[in-house]
Every structure is written in structure tokens, then in C-alpha cells.
């Protein structure tokens, strides 16, 4: 039995399979998900779990270099937008794109995590990073 970290088997698999530049989408309960994209459905009831509740433990296990967010969030859900921004490390690039383009990018995901979130334009795309940089000397 796994002792700590993310316990969900499918989500753990998805995290372990992420490479540099791969896309992992965390979406609200009503977001359209293509049948040909691997989906981990964590939705339980309306509003639970929230996207932020999923992202926080994900950040403990997954290196990300960029986050994509629908630009509409700034006007439609400004309080949620500020909360979302507060959970990402300062070195992570935040990029805003129109919601229609956002939906297209989700279709390129290695996987999608559906939550119970019901805040408008709350979905995010995480772009995988790397945990090492530059030349590494081994065995020399």
C-alpha cells in the first residue's frame, strides 16, 4: 500500500507518465472531455473536490513549467483567479488564452482530471517541466 502522496491509482499513473512539455488538464465538472483522451474522474458532488484541492497535491509530485488559463477568468471569476494564482510557484509561467483555444489545447492532453468544481472558467492546463537543468556529471 502506498503510504503518502497521491493515492489514486489512475492519477498516480498519469503523473508518472508525464514528460517535459506534456499537458495535464484539470477541469471543472461541466467541461467537455473527448472520449479519446485519458480521463481521471475525481468529481464527487457539485463543488467537490475543487480544482485548487487537486492542484496543491499535484504540485508536490509533478514539475510544471507553465500553466494555461482561459483569459475570461479575469473578468468572470476574479476572486477565484487570484486564489488560483496564489498556489503556483513564482517561477511557473502563467499564460492566458481564449476559452475556445483552451478547449482545443485540452484535447492535446496526455490526460484530463475532472473535478467537482463549478466556478466559471476555472479549468487549468499544466505543462510538464523538468527537475534538472544543465550538464550533469556522473561516473567521471
From Swiss-Prot:
Cellular component per GO, a single term: cytosol
Family matches, as Pfam families: RbsD_FucU
Name used for this protein in its record: D-ribose pyranase
Single GO MF descriptor: intramolecular lyase activity
Gene name tied to this protein: rbsD
InterPro entries to which the protein is assigned, alphabetical: D-ribose_pyranase, RbsD-like_sf, RbsD_FucU
Subunit organization: Homodecamer.
Family stated for the protein in its record: Belongs to the RbsD / FucU family. RbsD subfamily.
Primary location group: cytoplasm
EC class of the enzyme, as a word: isomerase
Annotated signal sequence range: none
NCBIfam families: PRK11797.1
Function: Catalyzes the interconversion of beta-pyran and beta-furan forms of D-ribose.
Active site residues according to the UniProt entry: 20
Amino acid at each position: 500500500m502506498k503510504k503518502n502522496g497521491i493515492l489514486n491509482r489512475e492519477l498516480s499513473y498519469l503523473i508518472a507518465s508525464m514528460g517535459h512539455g506534456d499537458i495535464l488538464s484539470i477541469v471543472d465538472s461541466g467541461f467537455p472531455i473527448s472520449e479519446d483522451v485519458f480521463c481521471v474522474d475525481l468529481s464527487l458532488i457539485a463543488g467537490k473536490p475543487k480544482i485548487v484541492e487537486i492542484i496543491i497535491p499535484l504540485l508536490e509530485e509533478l514539475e510544471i513549467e507553465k500553466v494555461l488559463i482561459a483569459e475570461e477568468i479575469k473578468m468572470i471569476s476574479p476572486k477565484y483567479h487570484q486564489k488560483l494564482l496564489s498556489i503556483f510557484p513564482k517561477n511557473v509561467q502563467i499564460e492566458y488564452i481564449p476559452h475556445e483555444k483552451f478547449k482545443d489545447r485540452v484535447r492535446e492532453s496526455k490526460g484530463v482530471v475532472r473535478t467537482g468544481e463549478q466556478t466559471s472558467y476555472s479549468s487549468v492546463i499544466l505543462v510538464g517541466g523538468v527537475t534538472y537543468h544543465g550538464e550533469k556529471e556522473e561516473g567521471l
